[in-house]
């Protein structure tokens, strides 16, 4: 009798010690697109006693502006990774789908908990006519288990966030995204001949990347080199202040993105270690939130192996968790023909920007052929939706067959002021006045042609490297002038 009593007490003790089911909800994505399937809205992280069974999960559309824009609601899962990919057959498992009815949906889907956390993703298919800039939201109201218990997940937000920002449908039909180095914001180099930011620019492009930051191998945030013996921090901080002033003066709706680059060695080291990777994700998220950015762009040149690309994918998954509820976008710049893997990294991005230039072929370092090839790779190799493919334009020249001699477009033009708009190469003169090497670039006609192709093929837009080296926008030979005649920030919602 005593032994039976002891056994019952032991079983009761084990039951009391068994971990209760815990659930966390994170809003890891804040940018959504019209006419796109499997767009993640919420991540659930669930832990509990191994063997415990979940029998159903209920959601509502929360503060979604127009619930009717949600064509399909999907539930997916994975138990050993916190990232989401829409190519579900490879990396996560789509378990169920349905539609909201009377303001909710209950998935009667069974999950058995294991020793690792279970990650469940709620994703939406949005209608082609979804309201631009409309809110996209979800609330998990109940997670039910086999033993009759009901749990409502705790919403986890980014550490630096004071108030959650509900995700929104991207407000523009495409992106025009210049990179802008901080030392150019108030003038640098040949200031009277190069373009510099004015309020007008902020109502023409849709996003601006403040290309100012870097990282350390320990996962800390650093500043890029400012040049000229200036303080890296002061130049970057003053540039951000000026960018915000111009943005406000223009009453612009353009997004401001924090650009991280010049970090090959440190980035390689940091993302290879799970602890450092998470530290860097938290630091980067805090940095962007505290400074009021709308996005984070990573220009890592370059991950040189599949392992490094996979580590970048792990990092982006961690970064999304650390950005929970902020609405901040994540993008990368990539030479998409160079060791970029399918799905693992590219699926997690809000958009990718192709570096469709610096090609060593003899015709042009940034040909139309390369531009179209990169679009094809993103669509057919990475299976990326068109809305997420932003194609790169160069506003600079390369010496033919080399990458060691480059000049901004305004310099090339001012050395050859009689160039016609259809010219894409010229010989530069040496210092002694003799004929120098051939340089290739994109003239106004080719820039316009590329923009028309991107628009007609409904791509996600264009990115510009060396935007600040263009001629002033009112100049007849300005590349940005040619670009904005085809693609510009719409004055009204489209």
For each feature predicted by the language model, list its residue ranges.
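Conserved, mostly hydrophobic/aromatic
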Residues: 208, 298, 319, 352, ...
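Substrate-binding surface in catalytic domains of secreted glycosidases
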Residues: 187-188, 217-238, 282, 302-418
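Short, well-ordered coil/turn segments that N-cap beta-strands
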Residues: 174, 204-206, 251-256, 292-294, ...
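Glycan-binding loop/region signatures in secreted carbohydrate-active enzymes
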Residues: 386-453, 473-494
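Glycan-recognition patch characteristic of GH18 chitinases/ENGases
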Residues: 170-286, 478-481, 488
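A cross-domain feature marking catalytic cores of carbohydrate-active enzymes
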Residues: 180-182, 212, 258-262, 300-302, ...
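Exposed, polar/acidic Ser/Thr-rich sequence context and nearby capping/turn residues
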Residues: 17-170
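Sec-dependent N-terminal signal peptides
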Residues: 3-12
